[in-house]
Design a protein with these regions (language model features):
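Short intrinsically disordered, low-complexity coil segments enriched in acidic
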Residues: 1-8, 129, 136-137, 265
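Charged, often flexible domain-edge or linker segments that flank or initiate folded functional domains
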Residues: 2-43, 49, 322
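Non-catalytic DNA-recognition/assembly elements of restriction-modification systems
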Residues: 48-51, 106, 147-155, 256-324
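Polybasic, glycine- and aromatic-enriched phosphate-binding surface used to engage nucleic acids
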Residues: 29-261
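Phosphate/oxyanion-binding loops and surfaces in catalytic or ligand/nucleic-acid-binding neighborhoods
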Residues: 4, 11, 23, 114-117, ...
């Protein structure tokens, strides 16, 4: 500290000049940026012409009792119940319930990082979620679903949902889980965004982006680009070296909407990336994995090159962005 105050050891010290305006900085993070990074971030912001809105982003399902934990198993007096599905079900548990066609309509395909990758989402789910909205706080609503009712009744003592005994704690607007959308893991070592066009229900570990104002494949490319990663690192929220891609940072992203031709070009590259990621995910031999990883890396470079151009970054700025 004394060396710092005396101006010694400058080679190990980074100094920042800051102008803090109280009314602007109130209730926000104060970020320390070196001059080069600040110039690039301002350049990115100036070239942005779009952004996401509140109504286009939703957090995933909140279900405190997804599976039975040890404490709940002890409360229920049966340690063997630990790991058993409550609102979430494994494939075996789903099949064992012998659900009627009406009951199956209430159980939705549930996805985790096991199926959701950068760009590519595998539609073959391994888990299910009993998707009961707040209306199931009324116990009579469950009468039409006897097998599901019997299942949840076994855990009624430990269900703490605001909509107990049968409703999820926070089910969310179902439109976000249906059809074309982008799914984003909230806490991650590397930000990644998954394009899905199938019904895809996720937990609160994810945010879901659904909008008709963007070509969603194009938007997936922008969100997975080095430009947005750079922005999130220095203008978003970080927990140590991990990115915390919450709703607020997503709302502040400096997005861009170019011509339809430019959007179409990136969309084609995204289609190729999704195919390559799918093939990589199912590859068995080391040689196939190596070849497909090289293909993914090439496509990544092509996508980033296009995005750098859209934001008007210079060659020197690109070098800084790629160093992170």
């Amino acid at each position: 500290m004394l060396d710092f105050l005396a101006g010694n050891g400058e080679e190990n010290i980074t100094r920042f000049e800051a102008e803090i305006v109280k009314n602007v900085c109130k209730d926000t993070y104060i970020l320390f940026l070196n001059k080069k990074n600040s110039v690039i971030l301002n350049h990115i912001k100036r070239n942005s012409n779009a952004g996401l809105t509140e109504g286009e982003i939703a957090q995933g399902i909140v279900a405190p009792q997804d599976f039975c934990n040890r404490a709940s198993a002890l409360t229920l007096g049966n340690e063997n119940l630990q790991g058993t599905g409550i609102f979430n079900l494994s494939m075996d548990e789903y099949n064992a319930l012998n659900l009627s066609s009406e009951e199956k309509e209430l159980v939705k395909p549930f996805y985790t990082s096991t199926e959701l990758y950068r760009y590519y989402g595998n539609a073959n789910n391994k888990l299910w979620v009993i998707y009961t909205t707040s209306k199931f706080k009324n116990k009579s609503e469950m009468k039409a679903y006897p097998n599901l009712k019997a299942h949840l009744d076994k855990f009624i003592q430990v269900i703490t949902s605001d909509n107990k005994p049968y409703g999820l704690h926070r089910a969310r607007d179902e439109k976000f889980f249906r059809g074309e959308k982008i799914v984003s893991l909230r806490k991650t070592a590397e930000p990644y965004f998954t394009y899905t066009d199938f019904d895809c229900y996720v937990s609160q570990s994810y945010n879901v982006i659904k909008t008709e104002r963007f070509n969603l494949k194009f938007l997936t490319a922008i969100l997975n680009s080095n430009v947005i990663k750079f922005w999130l690192r220095y203008k978003g929220k970080m927990q140590g070296d991990n990115f915390q891609v919450d709703k607020e940072p997503l709302l502040e992203l400096p997005l861009i909407v170019p011509t339809e031709l430019e959007q179409a070009h990136l969309s084609v590259l995204v289609d190729q990336m999704i195919t390559a990621q799918e093939q990589l995910n199912s590859a068995i031999s080391d040689s196939d994995k190596k070849f497909l990883q090289q293909r993914v890396d090439i496509l990544d470079k092509q996508i980033n090159t296009v995005v750098y151009g859209l934001y008007g970054l210079t060659a020197d700025e690109v070098k800084i962005v790629e160093r992170g």
